[in-house]
A protein has these predicted regions:
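...with weaker cross-activation on analogous glycine-rich loops/strands in unrelated enzymes
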Residues: 3-6, 43-109, 113-114
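A glycine-biased structural micro-motif
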Residues: 10-14, 21-22
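Short secondary-structure junctions and interdomain/linker hinges
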Residues: 16-19, 69
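Short glycine- and Lys/Arg-enriched binding-loop motifs that mark or flank ligand-binding interfaces
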Residues: 17, 23, 28, 88, ...
Length: 115
């Protein structure tokens, strides 16, 4: 059984943002946050940019990790795939009332109330 992803993600709050980062001591991006929080190790994407329009690609990547798509009724510990801008796709860990994610603008992992 995997560790609680919310507890794991909260330990990462404040870790510096680093594109393609996979190690908390060096920095994480949103994919790295998900890799660490959910304890993933196989088929982890690389070579992507901060901008992407290919939502279908990211949905396939997420399904390949065993996650199930849900449009509403999110639960604590769910992985959220969101589109914060027209050319941006983002991942985060839903706590039940906030989203833990890698914020490139703020330069670190943060917890944002609501969504």
């Amino acid at each position: 059984m995997r560790n609680d992803p919310v507890i794991s993600a909260r330990t990462l709050i404040g870790v510096p943002f680093r594109l393609h980062g996979r190690a908390p001591d060096l920095g994480l991006d949103c994919v790295g946050l998900v890799v660490v929080a959910y304890g993933l190790s196989e088929n982890v994407p690389t070579g992507y940019s901060l901008r992407s329009r290919d939502l279908a690609h990211w949905e396939r990547v997420i399904r390949a990790q065993g996650f199930v798509r849900r449009h509403a009724g999110w639960r604590r510990g769910d992985l959220l795939l969101v589109r914060p801008g027209p050319a941006q796709i983002h991942l985060g860990v839903w706590t039940g009332d906030s989203l833990i994610h890698a914020d490139a603008g703020l330069g670190r992992i943060v917890e944002t109330p609501g969504i």
